[in-house]
Amino acid sequence: MTTLKEMYEKEIVPGLKETFGYKNPMEVPKLDKIVLNIGLGEAINNVKLLDSAVEDLALIAGQRPVITKAKKSIAAFKLREGMPIGCMVTLRREKMYDFLLKLINITLPRVRDFRGISGKAFDGHGNYSLGIKEHIIFPEIDFDQTDSIKGLNVSIVTTAKTDKEGKELLKQFGMPFKN
């Protein structure tokens, strides 16, 4: 099986050049990075939740996450500036393509009642954001070892200038859009 990077260079670039009329292959949109983020508001009271989230995200991404801290104090949430409230990982190059392949072919089909992902979650500049309600759909996570089910944000950043270009790029990679 070819990797997504090889597929991009051999099939997707010529297809997008034809579809959008690009003259230069460097104009064709490409994946820039994939950012995985787990935000845990409950980590204010229970620091062990954050430790388990860091371990789970490291298993999912294949690299160590960075702990994110609160930028501002919010009294209503009993939150102080600098408190740890989540973790994130930025994937680039080979790990990015490996993660996308795993997401499309293994993880998303494991979602209960899966009929495709929404095609409306683009930001206006060709970047796509996907919310995953249960992180246990990833094959690396052992359901019995997990203390709680966490949500996960996946942001796919592309060099596309418009949502139409970004959606077509992800569709060519095999992203299962329902609309």
UniProtKB/Swiss-Prot annotation:
One biological process term from GO is:
translation
Q: Which GO terms describe its cellular component?
A: ribonucleoprotein complex; ribosome
Q: Cite the GO molecular-function annotations of the record.
A: rRNA binding; structural constituent of ribosome; tRNA binding
Summarize the subunit comment.
Answer: Part of the 50S ribosomal subunit; part of the 5S rRNA/L5/L18/L25 subcomplex. Contacts the 5S rRNA and the P site tRNA. Forms a bridge to the 30S subunit in the 70S ribosome.
This protein's UniProt keywords: Ribonucleoprotein, Ribosomal protein, RNA-binding, rRNA-binding, tRNA-binding
**Which Gene3D superfamilies does this UniProt record tie to the protein?**
3.30.1440.10
The UniProt family comment states: Belongs to the universal ribosomal protein uL5 family.
InterPro entries associated with the record: Ribosomal_uL5, Ribosomal_uL5_bac-type, Ribosomal_uL5_C, Ribosomal_uL5_CS, Ribosomal_uL5_dom_sf, Ribosomal_uL5_N
The identity of this protein, by name, is: Large ribosomal subunit protein uL5
NCBIfam families, alphabetically? PRK00010.1
- PANTHER family found in the cross-reference section: 60S RIBOSOMAL PROTEIN L11-RELATED (PTHR11994)
Explain the purpose of this protein. Answer: This is one of the proteins that bind and probably mediate the attachment of the 5S RNA into the large ribosomal subunit, where it forms part of the central protuberance. In the 70S ribosome it contacts protein S13 of the 30S subunit (bridge B1b), connecting the 2 subunits; this bridge is implicated in subunit movement. Contacts the P site tRNA; the 5S rRNA and some of its associated proteins might help stabilize positioning of ribosome-bound tRNAs.
Specify the superkingdom: Bacteria
Pfam families in UniProt: Ribosomal_L5, Ribosomal_L5_C
